[in-house]
Amino acid sequence: MRPALAVGLVFAGCCSNVIFLELLARKHPGCGNIVTFAQFLFIAVEGFLFEADLGRKPPAIPIRYYAIMVTMFFTVSVVNNYALNLNIAMPLHMIFRSGSLIANMILGIIILKKRYSIFKYTSIALVSVGIFICTFMSAKQVTSQSSLSENDGFQAFVWWLLGIGALTFALLMSARMGIFQETLYKQFGKHSKEALFYNHALPLPGFIFLASDIYDHAVLFNKSELYEIPGIGVTLPIMWFYLLMNIITQYVCIRGVFILTTECASLTVTLVVTLRKFVSLIFSILYFQNPFTLWHWLGTLFVFIGTLMYTEVWNNLGTTKSEPQKDNKKN
């Protein structure tokens, strides 16, 4: 029952989270900082109450290590959300972030001196080609859609390039954080709920530097049209409703992934997360009518096939199916 519940939470939480994020970004493209702050604050308060036991429970991993991890996590979160301000469409944002495998492999080779099989290198090549196709076609759309003047078109393209640079930086930083996390867990053991709390609580003072931008967008949110929440009858500005739902759905998504990792094999987790990304992408394209050409579909297909190849899904599924047959023969 718990694995089925976890899968339901991941699909319901993560997919709807993307929807509310896009609703926010479409109305106010620069709202990344207030969204990040609200998400961090909610998870930090929840963790302080239920994980840290109101601050009475000492951390299993020393705070100095969390400080390093938090710096990376805070940077990745802010940069990823800020990239939406830089002419980056939500579908490209999702596809580009699927390139985490490439970043993990590159840094794994450089830092951990890892070596991989030809099969894995082939899968990474597929992911790279897929991301390149989607990025290249998106670049053409940015320049063609900016038809006001040559200067406007060039300016839009420059902002888009900065957005691609921001996503690339966040991708590499996220991979580096994953390697650092891996070494910490080997040394101190896995404490994922504790890490979730400290990764969101410790960066909160850093939002002081973004306070002006957060306040400006809070004012803009207050000026948005009023919306009555169905069934409750409470009326509030619709942008605050979108933000509230974004926070709740992100929490549901995170909890679903956590339950999934504790209840299911890594193969199941990989399959569910990969399928969830694909469903989110399809919904974003169809519901929000984001421009998506045949080339984008081809690039997306390359990314997801490469991801499944890298995680050796087909090999593992074949092994899983053959095991019951062997057991039956023994009996």
Swiss-Prot record:
One of its GO terms (molecular function) is UDP-N-acetylglucosamine transmembrane transporter activity. It is a multi-pass membrane protein. The keyword Transport applies. GO terms for cellular component: endoplasmic reticulum membrane; Golgi membrane. Keywords: Endoplasmic reticulum, Membrane, Sugar transport, Transmembrane, Transmembrane helix, Transport. The chain crosses the membrane at residues 4-24, 30-50, 59-79, 92-112, 117-137, 153-173, 201-221, 229-249, 251-267, 268-288, 291-311. A motif (Mediates endoplasmic reticulum retention) lies at residues 326-331. Its main location: endoplasmic reticulum. It is found in: Endoplasmic reticulum membrane. It catalyses: UDP-N-acetyl-alpha-D-glucosamine(in) + UDP-alpha-D-glucuronate(out) = UDP-N-acetyl-alpha-D-glucosamine(out) + UDP-alpha-D-glucuronate(in); UDP-alpha-D-xylose(in) + UDP-alpha-D-glucuronate(out) = UDP-alpha-D-xylose(out) + UDP-alpha-D-glucuronate(in). Antiporter that transports nucleotide sugars across the endoplasmic reticulum (ER) membrane in exchange for another nucleotide sugar. May couple UDP-alpha-D-glucuronate (UDP-GlcA) or UDP-alpha-D-xylose (UDP-Xyl) efflux to UDP-alpha-D-glucuronate (UDP-GlcA) influx into the ER lumen, which in turn stimulates glucuronidation and excretion of endobiotics and xenobiotics. Belongs to the nucleotide-sugar transporter family. SLC35B subfamily. This is Nucleotide sugar transporter SLC35B4.
